[in-house]
Amino acid sequence: MAFLKSEGLHQFGELSDGGYGANAGVTWMPSTTGNVGLRFDFSYTVYGSESTPTCLTTPCWIEGDLVTRNNIFQVGIGPEWTMSNGPIQPYLYATAGPSSFFTTLEARHCGRRVYDDCSETNPDTYQSDWGLAWNAGGGLRYHFSEFFGLDLSYTYQHHGVRDYLVEGDLALNDDGTITIDNLRHSRANSLVFQIGLNINVPQWG
């Protein structure tokens, strides 16, 4: 499991503020002595969000926020080459699979006291664009014990030309309607830095 920080490239980078999210994956090594395995990745990135104060009831007895989030979901599979079998393991990998750019809207209400919890409704999706993406990157694992290690990586994500929204593109109108003011259409590629925990599961037999 890893935390990720992304920076968009070209027009996508100029329109968005960068993103943050999480990545989970597993690499299957068919041989205990081999250096080539099969990598599976699942990643989720939020590349923009905004909150709009609103009344959650009529009359306005309960106030809250409408939260807009711009997201990327991606699944990838491909080869991984580990260059060393010692405690320090540099590696290279490439994956390909489906990815989606989608924008959601949900209502959020928080209590007035500091220790009150916040509640959110299930998000509604107002725009989505599925397509094929591929990643190419490399990293370094440092195993500080037999089972656990630190994983650092840097990746180029290629999504190609996509339709997507950025902050301010989804309009919340005074009459209660929701419209898309500006649907963006451009290349939407990114550079991604990840830091996380690596768990090593030994092979028996």
Which positions does each model-derived feature cover?
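Transmembrane beta-strands of outer-membrane beta-barrel pores
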Residues: 1-7, 42-48, 96-104, 156-160, ...
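Short glycine/proline- and aromatic-enriched beta-strand/turn motifs that initiate or cap beta-hairpins
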Residues: 1-31, 103, 185-205
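Short sequence motifs at beta-strands and strand-loop junctions characteristic
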Residues: 14-20, 67-74, 124-133, 185-189
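Outer-membrane beta-barrel channels and translocator barrels
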Residues: 29-33, 84-88, 143-145, 202-204
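Residues on the lipid-exposed face of transmembrane beta-strands in outer-membrane beta-barrel proteins
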Residues: 22-28, 42-44, 75-81, 94-98, ...
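Extracellular loop and loop/strand-boundary signature of outer-membrane beta-barrel proteins
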Residues: 7-14, 60-67, 118-126, 178-185
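Predominantly the C-terminal beta-signal and adjacent terminal strand-loop region
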Residues: 136, 144-205
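Outer-membrane beta-barrel translocator domains and adjoining extracellular loop/strand segments
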Residues: 7-13, 49-59, 102-117, 163-170
